[in-house]
Amino acid sequence: VSRAIVHFLRNNREEDRTLKKDFFLILQIAAYTIPVLGLLAFQHDFGTSLVFMAIFSGVVLISGVSWKIILPVFLTLAGGIALFLAVFLSDGGRAFLHQTLGMPTYQMNRILAWLNPFDYAQTMTFQQAQGQLAIASGGLLGQGFNVSNLLIPVRESDMIFTVIAEDFGFVGGLCLLLLYMFLVYKMLRITLKSNNQFYTYISTGFIMMLVFHIFENIGAVTGILPLTGIPLPFISQGGSAIVSNLIGIGLLLSMSHQNRVSEERKKESRLLRQKQLSRLHEKGII
């Protein structure tokens, strides 16, 4: 995707870009994204599909696509989500979605668990309900390190934030969010300072992936968003997740090093130019 955008920008100057060219750029990016989404659809992995959609959105935004295209698409998606929820909550809506449109039962159960977690607390929403109770029981300062009074299945995975909130309370959860914000801020600074377009788009995709993971995981365990099985970066148990996150951090550190090297070369070039000018001035040439 990054190579496709860089190739497009090299062939199209900023002043020559039109809505038609921006639309074809989106199609090029989508051509790389849709096959991955298709594979994830076969695996019924909706959470990871949302992650790739977040990466797709971030790359499209930074590529400079006109808001005349982005805004209508965003409004259409927002309207579609609102319409879906209206149908889902209406009388006979769930039957229509399941029997007519073929919506899987497990997806409907996840939405029900999100909308009414305590109505099914003894069956399919036991984990979500217990997680929200654990967060609430933490209070302001928490119950203390390694103190977990509530049983939450597999809490070391997607529900790890409930442990932090229960043990360290609101203050501990807020500190974790501030650390994530600081990390994202540093990554954005590195990305914006980079002169390499290819690296810029790759790092943007990684940042969007990380931000979505944080937003979705904490939003899901607190009941703001549906539970989709997205891990909390650098904290949740999972080998592949931590490896991919560390690869992304390594990329950002490499970009930071290259930025410093580039700045040092520019300083050396300016100093050399100043010395050459001073020598010419001493010889009376200028």
Residue locations for each model-derived region?
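A juxtamembrane structural motif centered on a specific transmembrane helix
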Residues: 217-286
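Hydrophobic alpha-helical transmembrane segments of multi-pass inner membrane proteins, especially
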Residues: 1-120, 166-197, 201-222, 251, ...
